[in-house]
Amino acid sequence: MSETSRTAFGGRRAVPPNNSNAAEDDLPTVELQGVVPRGVNLQEFLNVTSVHLFKERWDTNKVDHHTDKYENNKLIVRRGQSFYVQIDFSRPYDPRRDLFRVEYVIGRYPQENKGTYIPVPIVSELQSGKWGAKIVMREDRSVRLSIQSSPKCIVGKFRMYVAVWTPYGVLRTSRNPETDTYILFNPWCEDDAVYLDNEKEREEYVLNDIGVIFYGEVNDIKTRSWSYGQFEDGILDTCLYVMDRAQMDLSGRGNPIKVSRVGSAMVNAKDDEGVLVGSWDNIYAYGVPPSAWTGSVDILLEYRSSENPVRYGQCWVFAGVFNTFLRCLGIPARIVTNYFSAHDNDANLQMDIFLEEDGNVNSKLTKDSVWNYHCWNEAWMTRPDLPVGFGGWQAVDSTPQENSDGMYRCGPASVQAIKHGHVCFQFDAPFVFAEVNSDLIYITAKKDGTHVVENVDATHIGKLIVTKQIGGDGMMDITDTYKFQEGQEEERLALETALMYGAKKPLNTEGVMKSRSNVDMDFEVENAVLGKDFKLSITFRNNSHNRYTITAYLSANITFYTGVPKAEFKKETFDVTLEPLSFKKEAVLIQAGEYMGQLLEQASLHFFVTARINETRDVLAKQKSTVLTIPEIIIKVRGTQVVGSDMTVTVEFTNPLKETLRNVWVHLDGPGVTRPMKKMFREIRPNSTVQWEEVCRPWVSGHRKLIASMSSDSLRHVYGELDVQIQRRPSM
């Protein structure tokens, strides 16, 4: 095999990096061995006239390989599984004197030992785990082959050639884009590293192109649908382009560990011009607010066409795009949400909340933040680089939080290893362990410089970890896959193991932790609706025979969902007298006018209550967050819901606020029903309703979902969705 271009290697034989699927080197159509005698016509030997790949959606190849949903007219197969190719020759094939083989090539500088040049021999029987081609039909001038790929081969877009051997050299077909073949990971193949043995799980984690993302607050969980769109036109090529932009060597693209790690770095643009720019400051000039996106398709296609990072994303957007990337390539993946997620820069398993001596929060000393929720991904794969038992779900996170080996990425970290405290195993397990296992420490910073630990809350962080249930839109609690229940012996052993294997010990604090107080405090927040007043109820319970007086402080803040406060909108001090063995409730009215002018896009409020028992100097502290209920978009359809037939979709929104909404963008998406689209309204006045109608022509049958979002200068995170059942086109 010869190269079409020669490269100067500076006195050292080396092959340049092969890190672009899009780059090509053509193989020569003729490779002669010696001099061809005069009068010999090479065209008299067996010649290929055409190649058929059976690549239509309804053909066996795509149906058997579960790739019939891809909007791509090329052949798409999954590795480790046989597929059919038919070759037409210039004359009938005679196995006694004719010799040919199929060749697959990817990238430039193809090498057999790197897996970038694959000669596929004709064999009598296919062998599991090996490339091979078996003749399953000979008819006239045609030969049909059953070709089996290796379950470890590179994932990407291959160029296909047919080579015929003659006494004088090799005759090879010309480069033909129509025979290009995509090879993907195969969760249906037992020998593939991403093999998943449950069909319902494969349908959910590989083939489902619509998901549900959980957000909000642990006591007020909210949901939104997300269009992954992994089968949409152009998405597969974009996912390969993402790896090209990372300059990932092609020889590593068959390893799901490497692919998922590269993906976690490339979905964010922090240090590598990746897909999405993150922004958490509520300012989204020259971009789209994170809450406005309805799915991954627009984001990925814009990244591919502009070749520049797309603005803007936050954790659930990064997770949604990353899920598309993984599922598109064939790696089973899901989005998980961790409620009360610790962002622990030191991974020391401790989140410190510093208090003044009077009980107020010391914002200068308090640096750690607890996110109301954080979304990341899990990808399913074996981990041959780890001891037995640590395969399966791996945590991977593309939200740029911490630097890992010089880049902003996280994982894959074995969820099983995290649960048992084996944080020594790569990649980034200590960080994920801290996200779900840190303690919340309340510390009084005394004026003399000493610190006193007032309270330790070991159950606040990682309160609930959830994902979408299989086959439905409900919530599945997976907390016990990450951690043992608090207080169990296994939980203590996991923590000791994590400390032994490298997690940092909690910082030492001066003084001795105080004994449990005789007074308990808790508070509840009423269901809070955007633009309405609501109440907060604080309950004090005296468990002793003593009489106590209490001075309590309430701090109400507008916060980012990451737990970082933007502004304090209410501060209140009150005194409470508790008789022996009694309880008392204090109600605080939160008025809409106090918070409306400063709200951030997720309408998240955080309440911090501290109380000092004057007689004992004990400090009680509790904090809770709430997400205001935001009005929804209404979606309606009329007309026949049939593949290929027009149906009208109406998007409707009524402004319930007392102020005019300006610069309103409405987004509509629905994989298989409509391409992503958007419409702008200059303003929506109070109590006014706007409507937007579009005619759609579905191209995918079955259960589908329409998803809409609305964003404006002063109101965001407005969603709506509608389930539709698209019928097949009636046969004639």
From Swiss-Prot:
<keyword id="KW-0094">Blood coagulation</keyword>
<feature type="active site">
    <location>
        <position position="374"/>
    </location>
</feature>
<dbReference type="GO" id="GO:0003810">
    <property type="term" value="F:protein-glutamine gamma-glutamyltransferase activity"/>
</dbReference>
<dbReference type="GO" id="GO:0005576">
    <property type="term" value="C:extracellular region"/>
</dbReference>
<keyword id="KW-0225">Disease variant</keyword>
<dbReference type="GO" id="GO:0005615">
    <property type="term" value="C:extracellular space"/>
</dbReference>
<dbReference type="Pfam" id="PF01841">
    <property type="entry name" value="Transglut_core"/>
</dbReference>
<dbReference type="InterPro" id="IPR036238">
    <property type="entry name" value="Transglutaminase_C_sf"/>
</dbReference>
<dbReference type="InterPro" id="IPR050779">
    <property type="entry name" value="Transglutaminase"/>
</dbReference>
<dbReference type="GO" id="GO:0031093">
    <property type="term" value="C:platelet alpha granule lumen"/>
</dbReference>
<dbReference type="InterPro" id="IPR023608">
    <property type="entry name" value="Transglutaminase_animal"/>
</dbReference>
<dbReference type="GO" id="GO:0072562">
    <property type="term" value="C:blood microparticle"/>
</dbReference>
<dbReference type="GO" id="GO:0007596">
    <property type="term" value="P:blood coagulation"/>
</dbReference>
<feature type="binding site">
    <location>
        <position position="486"/>
    </location>
    <ligand>
        <name>Ca(2+)</name>
    </ligand>
</feature>
<dbReference type="InterPro" id="IPR036985">
    <property type="entry name" value="Transglutaminase-like_sf"/>
</dbReference>
<dbReference type="InterPro" id="IPR002931">
    <property type="entry name" value="Transglutaminase-like"/>
</dbReference>
<dbReference type="GO" id="GO:0072378">
    <property type="term" value="P:blood coagulation, fibrin clot formation"/>
</dbReference>
<feature type="glycosylation site" description="N-linked (GlcNAc...) asparagine">
    <location>
        <position position="614"/>
    </location>
</feature>
<dbReference type="InterPro" id="IPR008958">
    <property type="entry name" value="Transglutaminase_C"/>
</dbReference>
<keyword id="KW-0964">Secreted</keyword>
<dbReference type="GO" id="GO:1990234">
    <property type="term" value="C:transferase complex"/>
</dbReference>
<protein>
    <recommendedName>
        <fullName>Coagulation factor XIII A chain</fullName>
        <ecNumber>2.3.2.13</ecNumber>
    </recommendedName>
</protein>
<feature type="site" description="Cleavage; by thrombin; to produce active factor XIII-A">
    <location>
        <begin position="38"/>
        <end position="39"/>
    </location>
</feature>
<feature type="binding site">
    <location>
        <position position="439"/>
    </location>
    <ligand>
        <name>Ca(2+)</name>
    </ligand>
</feature>
<dbReference type="GO" id="GO:0062023">
    <property type="term" value="C:collagen-containing extracellular matrix"/>
</dbReference>
<dbReference type="InterPro" id="IPR038765">
    <property type="entry name" value="Papain-like_cys_pep_sf"/>
</dbReference>
<feature type="binding site">
    <location>
        <position position="491"/>
    </location>
    <ligand>
        <name>Ca(2+)</name>
    </ligand>
</feature>
<feature type="active site">
    <location>
        <position position="397"/>
    </location>
</feature>
<keyword id="KW-0963">Cytoplasm</keyword>
<dbReference type="InterPro" id="IPR013808">
    <property type="entry name" value="Transglutaminase_AS"/>
</dbReference>
<feature type="binding site">
    <location>
        <position position="437"/>
    </location>
    <ligand>
        <name>Ca(2+)</name>
    </ligand>
</feature>
<keyword id="KW-0479">Metal-binding</keyword>
<dbReference type="InterPro" id="IPR014756">
    <property type="entry name" value="Ig_E-set"/>
</dbReference>
<dbReference type="InterPro" id="IPR001102">
    <property type="entry name" value="Transglutaminase_N"/>
</dbReference>
<keyword id="KW-0356">Hemostasis</keyword>
<feature type="propeptide" description="Activation peptide">
    <location>
        <begin position="2"/>
        <end position="38"/>
    </location>
</feature>
<dbReference type="Pfam" id="PF00868">
    <property type="entry name" value="Transglut_N"/>
</dbReference>
<dbReference type="GO" id="GO:0018149">
    <property type="term" value="P:peptide cross-linking"/>
</dbReference>
<feature type="modified residue" description="N-acetylserine">
    <location>
        <position position="2"/>
    </location>
</feature>
<keyword id="KW-0808">Transferase</keyword>
<comment type="subunit">
    <text>Tetramer of two A chains (F13A1) and two B (F13B) chains.</text>
</comment>
<keyword id="KW-0106">Calcium</keyword>
